C-alpha cells in the first residue's frame, strides 16, 4: 500500500525556444526527489507543461513567420523530448494553451469577479510608438531604481531582487525597437492581492517555505502587497478575458493555473485519478512546487491567494533553487555563454549531468556553477573509477569460474550491515533534498568497498591453486558485488540509466524495500562496459558547439 499521495510540479518552460542545460537543473532536482519517493512506495504524480502564452511568443512567431499555435506545439514536443532524454519521469507534460487551462482560467476568473476580487482602473504604461505595442515588463530594459544595476527588466531586478513597475525604471528602453518608449494610459484589470495579506502571512509561516525564501517574502510584506495586474492589451497571444473587446489574461495569470490544467488533462487520460482529490480545499494529498528563485513572488503570494479565493487547496511546500552559472559566468544567449540540451546529449550521457548536479544540490538557494573541468574530473572519479570499477573488477571471476553465481554466504556480514545501515541517513538526506551530502556519503561507502577489495586482494588468492582458495576468492569477489548492489540502490534516484543497466547485470530489481537481503547463491550476468570516461575532446565539442 502506498504511504502517501504526492503531486509534484516543475516550473513551466517558456515555449519560445530550446532548453539549455541550466533549465535542466530544476527538472533533475525534482526528478531525483520524485524517484526517491516512488522507491519508498509513495504514490507520486509528477507533471509539467510548456508556458505557451505572452508577447514574447507572439513576437517570436512573427519573426519566424509562423502561426504561434504551430510554433508552440513544435517547441512543446522538443521540450518534452529533452526531458525524456534526461529521463525526467513525468506522468504528464502538457501546455498552458489547452482546453483544460482555458476552462479553469475562465472559471477562476468568474469566481474572482463574483467575489469582488477584480478591480479595474486606468494606468500609465510604456508604449513603443514605432511598433504600436504596449510594452510588457520583460520587454523594457533599464537601470534598477534601487541598486542602479544596468540592463534590468521592467518588473524586477535580478541583482538585488527589488520589485517595481516599469515606470520606476531609470532610462527605460524598448527591447523590441531599442527606442525610448512613451507613456500612454490604458484600462486594466487587477487582482486584489492586499485582501489576502493576513491569511498569506499566516500561511508563509506554516513551514511551506525554506528559511531563506521566508526572509525574502517577509520583505515584500513590509513594503505592502499591491494589487496585481492580470490583463494585457492586444496585440497579444493568449486567452481573451471574457466580456472585454481587446484584453487578454496576463501570462502569469494562466501559467500557475497550468499546473491544474495539466493535472486535469492527466485525469482525462487516467480515469482512476480524481481531480477533486488533489485540488479540493480539504485534500490530504501533498502538493509540492519546484521553482527557481526568480519566480518566488508569483508562487508564494499571487498563486496561493488565487487558490484561496476560489476555495482550492494551497501547496504543501515550495522548493526554491538557485540559478546555474556556466564556468563562473551567468548563462546568456546574447553573450554566447549557454549550451542547449541537444548539444549536450549529442556528446554525453544524461546520467553524468544528473550526477554532477546532484553533487551540487542542497535545500539551500545557492547558485550552482557548472565547471566543465570539475564536471569531467568528478564524473570520471566517482561514477567510472569508484562505482563501475567495483562491478567490473569483481564480476569477471564470478562469470568465468562460477557460471555467474555469487557465493551462498557473505564474506563479511558486519561490512554489509554497515552499508545497509546507511540507508536511514541517506534516505533522510534524499527526503530533505540534501543531495550533495547524500552523494558524499555514498561515495564514502564506495571508497570503503574498493578499499575492502584492495586489502583482500582476491586476485592473489586465485593464483594459489586449489578449490579452497578459489572458494575464498569467490566469496570476496561476491562481497564486492553485494556492496555494488547496495550502492546502486542508493544511486537509483539519481542515475536511471546506470540503475537500469545494473538491474540487467545483477539480474534483479533494485529496491529500497529489499536492500537488507543480500543476493546469495544468485546468478548475475556478464558485466559490459556501457559507460566511458569523459575526455577533453567531448568537453571541447560541447563548449565550442
Swiss-Prot record:
Binds 1 zinc ion per subunit. Its EC number is 6.1.1.10. PROSITE patterns: AA_TRNA_LIGASE_I (PS00178). A motif ('HIGH' region) lies at residues 13-23. Gene3D superfamilies: HUPs, Isoleucyl-tRNA Synthetase, Domain 1, Methionyl-tRNA synthetase, Zn-domain. It is found in: Cytoplasm. It comes from the Bacteria. Zn(2+) binds at residues 144, 147, 157, 160. It catalyses: tRNA(Met) + L-methionine + ATP = L-methionyl-tRNA(Met) + AMP + diphosphate. ATP binds at residue 333. Belongs to the class-I aminoacyl-tRNA synthetase family. MetG type 1 subfamily. Monomer. PANTHER family: METHIONINE--TRNA LIGASE, METHIONINE--TRNA LIGASE, CYTOPLASMIC. Is required not only for elongation of protein synthesis but also for the initiation of all mRNA translation through initiator tRNA(fMet) aminoacylation. This is Methionine--tRNA ligase. It comes from Blochmanniella floridana. The gene is metG.
Amino acid at each position: 500500500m502506498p504511504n502517501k499521495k504526492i503531486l509534484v510540479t516543475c516550473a513551466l518552460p517558456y515555449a519560445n525556444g530550446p532548453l539549455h542545460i541550466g533549465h535542466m537543473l530544476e527538472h533533475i532536482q525534482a526528478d531525483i526527489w520524485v524517484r526517491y519517493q516512488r522507491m519508498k512506495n509513495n504514490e507520486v504524480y509528477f507533471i509539467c507543461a510548456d508556458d505557451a502564452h505572452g508577447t514574447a511568443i507572439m513576437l517570436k512567431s512573427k519573426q519566424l513567420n509562423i502561426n504561434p499555435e504551430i510554433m508552440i506545439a513544435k517547441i512543446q514536443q522538443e521540450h518534452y523530448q529533452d526531458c525524456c532524454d534526461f529521463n525526467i519521469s513525468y506522468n504528464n507534460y502538457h501546455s498552458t494553451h489547452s482546453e483544460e487551462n482555458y476552462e479553469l482560467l475562465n472559471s477562476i476568473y468568474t469566481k474572482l469577479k463574483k467575489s469582488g476580487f477584480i478591480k479595474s482602473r486606468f494606468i500609465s504604461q510604456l508604449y513603443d510608438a514605432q511598433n504600436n505595442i504596449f510594452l510588457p515588463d520583460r520587454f523594457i530594459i533599464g537601470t534598477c531604481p534601487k541598486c542602479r544595476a544596468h540592463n534590468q527588466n521592467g518588473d524586477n531586478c535580478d541583482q538585488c531582487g527589488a520589485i517595481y513597475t516599469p515606470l520606476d525604471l531609470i532610462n527605460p528602453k524598448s527591447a523590441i525597437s531599442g527606442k525610448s518608449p512613451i507613456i500612454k494610459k490604458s484600462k486594466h484589470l487587477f487582482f486584489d492581492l492586499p485582501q489576502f495579506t493576513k491569511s498569506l502571512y499566516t500561511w508563509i509561516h506554516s513551514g511551506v517555505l525554506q528559511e531563506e525564501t521566508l526572509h525574502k517574502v517577509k520583505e515584500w510584506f513590509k513594503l505592502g502587497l499591491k494589487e496585481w495586474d492580470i490583463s494585457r492589451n492586444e496585440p497579444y497571444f493568449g486567452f481573451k478575458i471574457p466580456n472585454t473587446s481587446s484584453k487578454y489574461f496576463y501570462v502569469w495569470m494562466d501559467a500557475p493555473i497550468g499546473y491544474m490544467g495539466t493535472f486535469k488533462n492527466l485525469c482525462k487520460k487516467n480515469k482512476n485519478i480524481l481531480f477533486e482529490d488533489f485540488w479540493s480545499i480539504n485534500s490530504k494529498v501533498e502538493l509540492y512546487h519546484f521553482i527557481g528563485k526568480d519566480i518566488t513572488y508569483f508562487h508564494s503570494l499571487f498563486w496561493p491567494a488565487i487558490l484561496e479565493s476560489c476555495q482550492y487547496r494551497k501547496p504543501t511546500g515550495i522548493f526554491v533553487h538557485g540559478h546555474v552559472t556556466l564556468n563562473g559566468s551567468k548563462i546568456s544567449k546574447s553573450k554566447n555563454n549557454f549550451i542547449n540540451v541537444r548539444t549536450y546529449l549529442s556528446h554525453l550521457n544524461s546520467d553524468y549531468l544528473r550526477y554532477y548536479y546532484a553533487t551540487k544540490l542542497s535545500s539551500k538557494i545557492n547558485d550552482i556553477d557548472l565547471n566543465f573541468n570539475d564536471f569531467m574530473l568528478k564524473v570520471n572519479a566517482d561514477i567510472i573509477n569508484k562505482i563501475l570499477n567495483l562491478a567490473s573488477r569483481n564480476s569477471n571471476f564470478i562469470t568465468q569460474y562460477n557460471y555467474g553465481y555469487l557465493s551462498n554466504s557473505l564474506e563479511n556480514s558486519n561490512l554489509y550491515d554497515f552499508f545497509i545501515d546507511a540507508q536511514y541517513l541517506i534516505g533522510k538526506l534524499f527526503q530533505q533534498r540534501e543531495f550533495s551530502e547524500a552523494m558524499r556519503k555514498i561515495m564514502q561507502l564506495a571508497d570503503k568497498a574498493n578499499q575492502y577489495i584492495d586489502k583482500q586482494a582476491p586476485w592473489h588468492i586465485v593464483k594459489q591453486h586449489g578449490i579452497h582458495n578459489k572458494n575464498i576468492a569467490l566469496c570476496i569477489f561476491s562481497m564486492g558485488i553485494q556492496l555494488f548492489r547496495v550502492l546502486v540502490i542508493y544511486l537509483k534516484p539519481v542515475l536511471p540509466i546506470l540503475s537500469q543497466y545494473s538491474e540487467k547485470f545483477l539480474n534483479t530489481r533494485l529496491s529500497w524495500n529489499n536492500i537488507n537481503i543480500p543476493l546469495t547463491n544468485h546468478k548475475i550476468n556478464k558485466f559490459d562496459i556501457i559507460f566511458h570516461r569523459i575526455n577533453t575532446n567531448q568537453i571541447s565539442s560541447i563548449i565550442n558547439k
